Amino acid sequence: MIWMFKRIDHVGIAVKNLEEAIKIWEGLGFKVEEIEEVPDQKVKVAVIKVGENRIELLEATTEDSPIAKFIEKRGEGIHHLAIRVENIESKLEELKQKGYKLIDEKPRVGAGGAKIAFIHPKSVTGVLLELCERKE
């Protein structure tokens, strides 16, 4: 079964220092709408709205967080691409049936209370892809 994505939800950008990153992005003319800590993911998130899309600046809150490990290995930069979907559970099941390598077989709670799940980059041409279901 082929399913449609709703749209790009956000681009996640890993940063070493959230305050410094906010100054840079605000200097470009963007406005941070909210800052939130997601303890379960060991990350602090600054949300910049760009039309219907978002940029999320991601700062690690612990040395063992996925963002800290990413920065240590690759440096600051684009961490993931998030796609807005409906019924994330069925999307994950479909991808699993098709043989995609899933980091999350079941959704978890992300920033803003969204249901999220990641697909492994080895299954998606080297891109960490996040599926994201939000209440409209």
UniProtKB/Swiss-Prot annotation:
Family indicated by similarity: Belongs to the methylmalonyl-CoA epimerase family.
Species the sequence originates in: Pyrococcus horikoshii (strain ATCC 700860 / DSM 12428 / JCM 9974 / NBRC 100139 / OT-3)
Protein name: Methylmalonyl-CoA epimerase
Metal-binding keyword on record: yes
All copies of domain VOC, residue ranges: 7-134
Superkingdom, natural source: Archaea
GO biological process: L-methylmalonyl-CoA metabolic process
Catalytically driven reaction(s): (R)-methylmalonyl-CoA = (S)-methylmalonyl-CoA
Keywords, alphabetical: Cobalt, Isomerase, Metal-binding
PROSITE patterns, per database record: VOC
EC nos: 5.1.99.1
Pfam families, A to Z: Glyoxalase_4
GO MF annotations, alphabetized: metal ion binding; methylmalonyl-CoA epimerase activity
Record keyword Metal-binding present: yes
Database matches in CDD domains: MMCE (cd07249)
Binding site for Co(2+): 10, 80, 130
Temperature dependence: Highly thermostable: is fully active after 60 minutes at 100 degrees Celsius and loses less than 10 per cent of its activity after 100 minutes at the same temperature.
